From Swiss-Prot:
<keyword id="KW-0479">Metal-binding</keyword>
<dbReference type="InterPro" id="IPR000484">
    <property type="entry name" value="Photo_RC_L/M"/>
</dbReference>
<dbReference type="GO" id="GO:0009535">
    <property type="term" value="C:chloroplast thylakoid membrane"/>
</dbReference>
<keyword id="KW-0148">Chlorophyll</keyword>
<feature type="transmembrane region" description="Helical">
    <location>
        <begin position="197"/>
        <end position="218"/>
    </location>
</feature>
<feature type="modified residue" description="N-acetylthreonine">
    <location>
        <position position="2"/>
    </location>
</feature>
<keyword id="KW-0812">Transmembrane</keyword>
<dbReference type="GO" id="GO:0005506">
    <property type="term" value="F:iron ion binding"/>
</dbReference>
<feature type="transmembrane region" description="Helical">
    <location>
        <begin position="274"/>
        <end position="288"/>
    </location>
</feature>
<feature type="site" description="Tyrosine radical intermediate">
    <location>
        <position position="161"/>
    </location>
</feature>
<dbReference type="GO" id="GO:0016682">
    <property type="term" value="F:oxidoreductase activity, acting on diphenols and related substances as donors, oxygen as acceptor"/>
</dbReference>
<feature type="site" description="Cleavage; by CTPA">
    <location>
        <begin position="344"/>
        <end position="345"/>
    </location>
</feature>
<keyword id="KW-0007">Acetylation</keyword>
<feature type="transmembrane region" description="Helical">
    <location>
        <begin position="29"/>
        <end position="46"/>
    </location>
</feature>
<dbReference type="GO" id="GO:0010242">
    <property type="term" value="F:oxygen evolving activity"/>
</dbReference>
<feature type="propeptide">
    <location>
        <begin position="345"/>
        <end position="353"/>
    </location>
</feature>
<feature type="binding site">
    <location>
        <position position="344"/>
    </location>
    <ligand>
        <name>[CaMn4O5] cluster</name>
    </ligand>
</feature>
Amino acid sequence: MTAILEKRESASLWGRFCDWITSTENRLYIGWFGVLMIPTPLVATSVFIIAFIAAPPVYIDGIREPVPGSLLYGNNIRYGAIIPTSAAIGLHLYPIWEAASVDGWHYYVGPYELIVMHLLLGVARYMGREWELSFRLGMRPWIAVAYSAPVAAATAVFLIYPIGQGNFSDGMPLGISGTFNFMIVFQAEHNILMHPFHMLGVAGVFGGSLFSAMHGSLVTSSLIRETTENESANAGYKFGQEGETYNIVAAHGYFGRLIFQYASFNNSRSLHFFLAVWPVVGIWFTALGISTMAFNLNGFNFNQSVVDGQGRVINTWADIINRANLGMEVMHERNAHNFPLDLAVAEVTFIDG
């Protein structure tokens, strides 16, 4: 009898725990994806803070001297970074307990793999948590679908690109100057500015910002006043009210007169669908572009592609970009290039003015 009561009590305890985890009445929804998520960003964040302050230098290139990235080794907030794993390690996941010594692990591996893997697991599980909460509330799943865009971008940069290049040393350093260094080297090696998927991503991000600003300003400018002139317009509304707070017909009429009639939406659902789809699809394409360039399917190269009737090259901005790419690549891998052959053997044509 005692055993049966203990079993029932433990079962009810587990049941109460399950109900608490999946309850939508909590101030912050946890969910089963949240149970999986919580440890990973905590590990990534805590290791990042410790490493940013005190991590020893990492032998990132496999040649030359180790690169320090932490504050205690002479960097500041702008120049500090978590240095990627050494090129000597390749794509191996090298836990600290497999290293011959802790110093050797710091020298060749460092905390980069640990932080990046836990970060990617954390953001993916956060996306799952968004879907789970939507499911519990009977909502449609598009919030998680929209969040998949930055998840795809982070996965492309931190995982797909190193896999395509063959080692984690090509991953993006976790810091301000490290991010810009990654961008410059990426342009030098893959000509990303001339890749159509990157162009779609730029249109998505900047276009999304423009449309968001336009929508917000139109809504704020066409509020339905429920108060007198002596009171704030905000006092006439309450959170969750049934009635609309702004007049979409007025906003549609204003924008239609500002540009032309069919440039504005007269349907709120269509408008918000457009506002969601535009940046999300753009960022999806950027992530896809990073993933293709990871395997060296690079941007367009129009090097010396314009010639006159006698076959002489007419230099264009594309040739200027290629020269800049070569210069950036030499600065990045100065031991691997004595001088780029493309520049060394190029014929220089002087034109008398």
